[in-house]
């Protein structure tokens, strides 16, 4: 990747983050986080108490209150810093995207043809539906679809990948993005957006969105944290009259002070996760962008972590995607050359890799030269997901090629007969994992073109990982059932959908969702748009059509369908990070009980000294040590919140057990050690 990656505490990010953390001390900024708002109120209260004490005669009590007050403000500041660092990384990424926007001159065409009259205009004046000519060395002014031409395009400014890509009319690689550069040849591009609606504009808006919407899980966790805060607030408030009653009843001791009560409240409420919760969500989206995936919202990232069904396109995801014509298998009474000639004619205007490979194979095997489709007076019939075949009409000749079922229906509709020998050829090709493409002329079946595809190395192991995580994998392919079954068995997927149409994909997604499952899928074509819109996590390819990108809730800048698996990992990592830090935060309270409660009541109930398990030097030292630890642990956990916990592909039960051991037990043990070390330091320095 050529895009700059920032370290956690990069000075470029740290300086503005520190200033932003100070600005976030404004109560209006704290209002969105109820837990930290309570801490802010406690800070203000203690600041007033501290001022009153210094104005009075209780100087020793005032010094103690000053120490507690200062560290409570630091607690708030550190929580703000975590969020500011996460937001700073997103803003830096947005700034890098803004740097890609260039003011360029576009060559606007009067018509969608290379030879049409052109005039130079500012790119900002272009509108949806306009056509432009972009030649070698020029920057593509706007997002659009390639209407004519084939060119090598440098997309490193967008994707970070230095290797150029081919963009061409027809097929799934016709979309181009404004800000990228044409390296060779030329392209006629039809603009698909208006000013302010370009891919870069939308990405910048998503990345630096001023107000990030909370995700459902985040809202649920926030409600839990608020409930816990209210419970602890009520419990602490009751300690004041209880303390007064105890002093009067026992005849000795001192009532608990406001400073101690506030310190106890802040240490008991879930400030750790409360301070880091927003940062975890922002960092999740930032990690997606680091993986070259733009998420439209944190909701999409979170949904990726809950996914339990993955719909994966066979071509490009499970297989290498470069299916090539390998053999011509003629029907009885048809020569191989006749089949090759017809297949070549049907493929002359076919811009897909498969279509071009048929033309090349016919030329290699029989020296059949390409024809000019216009000179032949031919009419090309394009492929569609509904008909699942393409071809050409030349005078009274009607040549078609396509899937077995589509050609069987086509031949039958022309009162033709589908030979059993061809059925056998189809089965033989499919059983070996190849794709049979049937060719016909009129009502006569000419034979089969065998296409070969290769399963990607290591993909079977990745599917095994997903299975251990409880995720079901489903391969989506337009191939017949025999071919699909052979490739599915080789790749190790759990299920497959053969002869897939847009309607079939949409129905399958709805079926899984009706069972209460969350579904993820990738897509790049306009025909994928309905299914992408229905899926819970929909990753559209950057090289795909505008309709696909608008229907999805994520865009993969690398246009790599396999990235869906990485998206799921990042989503699960975000959920695990949130759960782990919540467990750690709640487990922290145990040590703070043993530090603060005995210290608060020891003058009234000396017997509580037995609960001083850490042998803290004095009540004031115990309370201040707990407050300092409560603040420092937020700083200590910022790297974990921003990077995410280490995720391993395991079952939910295994992950829960590991989570409870490391973050539950760790959350109990670490505060005992930390508070004791801070107490020793304070005593050694003579500050208590």
From Swiss-Prot:
Gene Ontology CC annotations of this record: plasma membrane
Top-level taxon in the UniProt lineage: Bacteria
Residues the record lists as binding Mg(2+): 524, 528
EC main group: translocase
Location of the active site: 313
Family under the similarity heading: Belongs to the cation transport ATPase (P-type) (TC 3.A.3) family. Type IA subfamily.
Protein name: Potassium-transporting ATPase ATP-binding subunit
Organism, as annotated: Tolumonas auensis (strain DSM 9187 / NBRC 110442 / TA 4)
This protein's encoding gene: kdpB
């Amino acid at each position: 990747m050529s895009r700059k990656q920032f370290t956690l505490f990069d000075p470029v990010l740290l300086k503005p983050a520190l200033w932003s953390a100070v600005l976030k001390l404004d109560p209006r900024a704290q209002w969105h986080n109820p837990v930290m708002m309570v801490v802010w109120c406690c800070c203000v209260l203690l600041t007033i108490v501290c001022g009153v004490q210094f104005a009075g005669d209780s100087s020793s009590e005032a010094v103690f209150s000053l120490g507690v007050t200062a560290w409570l403000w630091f607690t708030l500041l550190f929580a703000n810093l975590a969020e500011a660092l996460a937001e700073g990384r997103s803003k830096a990424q947005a700034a890098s995207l803004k740097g890609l926007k260039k003011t360029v001159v576009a060559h606007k065409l009067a018509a969608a043809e290379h030879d049409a009259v052109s005039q130079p205009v500012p790119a900002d004046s272009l509108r949806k539906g306009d056509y432009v000519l972009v030649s070698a060395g020029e920057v593509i002014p706007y997002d659009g679809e390639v209407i004519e031409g084939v060119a090598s395009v440098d997309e490193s400014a967008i994707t970070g990948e230095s290797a150029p890509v081919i963009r061409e009319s027809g097929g799934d690689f016709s979309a181009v993005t404004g800000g990228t550069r044409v390296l060779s040849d030329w392209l006629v591009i039809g603009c698909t957006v208006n000013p302010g609606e370009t891919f870069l504009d939308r990405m910048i808006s998503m990345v630096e969105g001023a107000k990030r919407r909370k995700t459902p899980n985040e809202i649920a966790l926030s409600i839990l944290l608020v409930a816990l805060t209210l419970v602890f607030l009520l419990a602490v408030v009751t300690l004041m009259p209880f303390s007064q009653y105890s002093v009067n009843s026992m005849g000795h001791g001192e009532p608990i002070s406001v400073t101690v009560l506030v310190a106890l409240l802040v240490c008991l409420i879930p400030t750790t996760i409360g301070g880091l919760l927003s940062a975890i969500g922002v960092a999740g989206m930032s990690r997606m962008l680091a993986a070259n995936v733009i998420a439209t919202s944190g909701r999409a990232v979170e949904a990726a972590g809950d996914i339990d069904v993955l719909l994966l396109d066979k071509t490009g995801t499970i297989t290498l995607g470069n299916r090539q014509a390998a053999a011509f298998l003629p029907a009885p009474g048809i020569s191989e050359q006749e089949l090759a000639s017809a297949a070549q004619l049907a493929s002359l205007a076919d811009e897909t890799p498969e279509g071009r490979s048929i033309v090349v194979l016919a030329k290699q095997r029989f020296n059949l030269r390409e024809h000019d489709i216009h000179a032949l007076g031919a009419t090309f019939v394009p492929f569609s997901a509904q008909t699942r075949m393409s071809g050409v009409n030349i005078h009274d000749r009607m040549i078609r090629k396509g899937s077995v079922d589509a050609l069987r229906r086509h031949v039958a509709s022309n009162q033709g007969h589908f030979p059993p020998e061809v059925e056998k050829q189809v089965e033989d090709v499919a059983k070996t994992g190849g794709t049979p493409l049937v060719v016909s002329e009129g009502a006569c079946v000419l034979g089969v073109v065998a296409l070969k595809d290769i399963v990607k190395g290591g993909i079977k192991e990745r599917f095994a990982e997903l299975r251990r995580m409880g995720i079901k994998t489903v391969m989506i392919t337009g191939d017949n059932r025999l071919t699909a079954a052979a490739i599915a068995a080789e790749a190790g997927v759990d299920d497959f959908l053969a002869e897939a149409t847009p309607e079939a994909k949409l129905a399958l997604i709805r079926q899984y969702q009706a069972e209460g499952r969350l579904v993820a899928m990738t897509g790049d074509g306009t025909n994928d748009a309905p299914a992408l819109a229905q899926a819970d996590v929909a990753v559209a390819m950057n090289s795909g059509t505008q309709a696909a990108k608008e229907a999805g809730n994520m865009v993969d800048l690398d246009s790599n369908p396999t990235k869906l698996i990485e998206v799921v990992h990042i989503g699960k990592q975000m959920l695990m990070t949130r759960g782990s830090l919540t467990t750690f935060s709640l487990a922290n309270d145990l040590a703070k009980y043993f530090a603060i409660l005995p210290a608060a009541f020891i003058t009234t109930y000396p017997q509580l000294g037995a609960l001083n398990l850490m042998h803290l030097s004095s009540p004031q030292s115990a309370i201040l040590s707990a407050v300092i630890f409560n603040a420092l642990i937020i700083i200590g956990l910022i790297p974990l919140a921003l990077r995410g916990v280490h995720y391993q592909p395991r079952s939910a039960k295994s992950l829960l057990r590991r989570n409870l051991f490391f973050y539950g037990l760790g959350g109990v043990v670490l505060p005992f050690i930390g508070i004791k070390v801070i107490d020793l330091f304070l005593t050694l320095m003579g500050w208590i």
